């Protein structure tokens, strides 16, 4: 007779969830990234990134033809944004450091931009002065254009040394105050959509700068597409470039961790992780072993691709079997650097999909075949969506998916400490709405409530999740979607000097998770509440 007692199933509060249901040291916060919010593309000594070049060369490939030159002007309004974080009572704020703002030429040898250093020092100091913990991402997809021109960016092994130097500079300048680092955001997303060039203009060399990620947030435009080999390796196909980029991202991550542990760990005592994108891969037929295996394989290609090397120094077995020599092997020295190069796992979760081993007969037009992984994905079964769509594309709302993803990571990836580094939902930017109407975001409010309830349920089952960061703090420039999609808790008025206003979700989040509400469930809230968000019509900024 076993002496091991089963984990008790504790009740979850559903949409009444609040901070009191979590332990006192659980972290609540929100996130952003540099190119999506900062703007000031030509201010303060910043150099161009691949996104600057891409958006200016091919504005027709951004849904509204916009770019991040101004974004939401957080470079100049960062104190106001930090005030918002404080008013919401968040523990943490996640932001990324713009590589070309620190190193305009990409490398240390090309020169350090002291104005960029000063900006991030001011940002970090302002956060700490307001009792907000910084979570800092080193790479959120903004490769300096100089490095893209020199050697094709992450298609070249040369970038590993340049990224290590950039990371070391950040540790030297900011590590005395920053204790929570994320090396790379969503390496799978960056890798999987790299190497695609569009025939406008029709010369491959003119498109060099646009060979970069095509974000998953927006369907690709119906334009002629020409896929071509890298100039750095003429014999490499675009499909192979995907794995070459991923390989170099992993080596760059390991190099950054090595330099930190060798030079800074003893004095700065920081922690590290990568923010890995996930998706619940639900077997189309859970009674079909082939579909179950296909779903497992799909998760390998989504998450295991970048997590497994940190545990074993090798890619997932399914990837090695299917890709063979197309997937580079790590050297013994590289394996030593990779294994254990994390303190926690950052999990980005938005949505779910059905996975099948064969083409679903009822969804032939919608099902997508993933050639390398040998599986199909579809968002519906027998004509019924896996979850309601948030908008016209890609994000089906499936709260139970985050629970299953967390359980999968616990059971199959050595039970790591986990932070939810991104979780959120978009709404279409409807310019016909009044300001009052635009701030009513019931879909997001319910999305956050339902997903947080599932995160709590996973904790009850022993998953070591220790924090939750909403994506995103504010509406921002959403990559290929431009300004057409809004992910923020805070509404940005793009037509009135980027004025900030709280949406209903921000007011709820503040009332439920303010750091002063570290109380037992069902106890009254403190009476000294400053009331900043008491009314959903209160304006945060006045121009």
Curated annotation (Swiss-Prot):
GO MF annotation: an example: beta-glucosidase activity
Protein name: Ipecoside beta-D-glucosidase IpeGLU1
UniProt site positions, description: Controls the gate shape and acceptance of substrates: 394
GO BP annotations listed: glucan catabolic process; isoquinoline alkaloid biosynthetic process
Reactions listed under catalytic activity: deacetylipecoside + H2O = deacetylipecoside aglycone + D-glucose; deacetylisoipecoside + H2O = deacetylisoipecoside aglycone + D-glucose; 6-O-methyldeacetylipecoside + H2O = 6-O-methyldeacetylipecoside aglycone + D-glucose; 6-O-methyldeacetylisoipecoside + H2O = 6-O-methyldeacetylisoipecoside aglycone + D-glucose
Temperature dependence: Optimum temperature is 55-60 degrees Celsius.
Regulation: Inhibited by Cu(2+), Fe(2+) and Zn(2+).
């Amino acid at each position: 007779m076993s002496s091991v007692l089963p984990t008790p199933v504790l009740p979850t509060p559903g949409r009444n969830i609040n901070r009191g249901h979590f332990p006192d040291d659980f972290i609540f916060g929100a996130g952003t990234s540099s190119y999506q919010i900062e703007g000031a593309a030509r201010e303060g000594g910043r150099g161009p990134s691949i996104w600057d070049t891409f958006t200016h060369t091919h504005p027709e490939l951004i849904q509204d033809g916009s770019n991040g030159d101004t974004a939401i002007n957080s470079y100049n309004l960062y104190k106001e944004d930090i005030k918002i974080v404080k008013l919401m009572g968040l523990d943490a704020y996640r932001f990324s450091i713009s590589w070309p703002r620190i190193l305009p030429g990409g490398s240390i040898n090309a020169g350090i931009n002291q104005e960029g250093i000063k900006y991030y020092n001011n940002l970090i100091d302002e956060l700490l002065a307001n009792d907000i913990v910084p979570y800092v991402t080193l790479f959120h997809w903004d490769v300096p254009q100089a490095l893209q021109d020199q050697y094709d960016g992450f298609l070249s092994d040369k970038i590993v040394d340049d990224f290590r130097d950039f990371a070391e500079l950040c540790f030297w300048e900011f590590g005395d105050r920053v204790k929570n680092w994320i090396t790379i955001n969503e390496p799978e997303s960056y890798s999987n959509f790299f190497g695609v060039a569009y025939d406008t203009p029709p010369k491959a060399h003119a498109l060099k700068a646009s060979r970069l990620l095509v974000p998953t947030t927006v369907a690709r435009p119906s334009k002629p597409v020409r896929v071509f080999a890298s100039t750095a390796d003429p014999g490499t196909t675009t499909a192979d470039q995907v794995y070459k980029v991923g390989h170099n991202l992993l080596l760059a991550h390991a190099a950054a961790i090595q330099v930190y542990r060798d030079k800074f760990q003893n004095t700065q005592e920081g922690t590290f992780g990568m923010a890995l994108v996930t998706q619940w891969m639900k077997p189309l037929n859970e009674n079909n072993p082939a579909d179950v295996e296909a779903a497992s394989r799909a998760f390998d290609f989504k998450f295991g691709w970048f997590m497994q090397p940190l545990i074993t120094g090798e890619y997932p077995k399914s990837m090695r079997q299917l890709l063979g020599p197309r997937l580079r092997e790590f050297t013994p020295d590289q394996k030593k650097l990779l294994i254990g190069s994390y303190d926690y796992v950052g999990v980005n979760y938005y949505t779910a999909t059905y996975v099948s081993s064969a083409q679903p007969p009822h969804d032939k037009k919608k099902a997508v075949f993933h050639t390398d992984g040998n599986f199909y994905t579809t968002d519906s079964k027998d004509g019924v969506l896996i979850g309601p769509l948030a908008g016209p594309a890609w994000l089906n709302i499936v709260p139970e998916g985050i629970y299953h993803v967390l359980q999968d990571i616990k059971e199959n990836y050595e039970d790591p400490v986990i932070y939810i580094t991104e979780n959120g939902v978009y709404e279409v930017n409807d310019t016909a709405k009044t300001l009052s109407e635009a701030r009513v975001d019931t879909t997001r409010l319910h999305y956050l409530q339902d997903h947080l309830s599932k995160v709590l349920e996973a904790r009850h089952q022993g998953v070591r999740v220790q924090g939750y960061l909403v994506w995103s703090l504010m509406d921002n420039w959403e990559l290929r979607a431009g300004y057409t999609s809004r992910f923020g808790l805070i509404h940005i008025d793009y037509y009135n000097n980027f004025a900030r206003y709280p949406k209903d979700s921000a007011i709820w989040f503040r009332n439920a998770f303010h750091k002063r509400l570290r109380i037992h469930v069902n106890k009254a809230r403190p009476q000294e509440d400053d009331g900043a968000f008491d009314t959903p019509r209160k304006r945060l900024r006045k121009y």
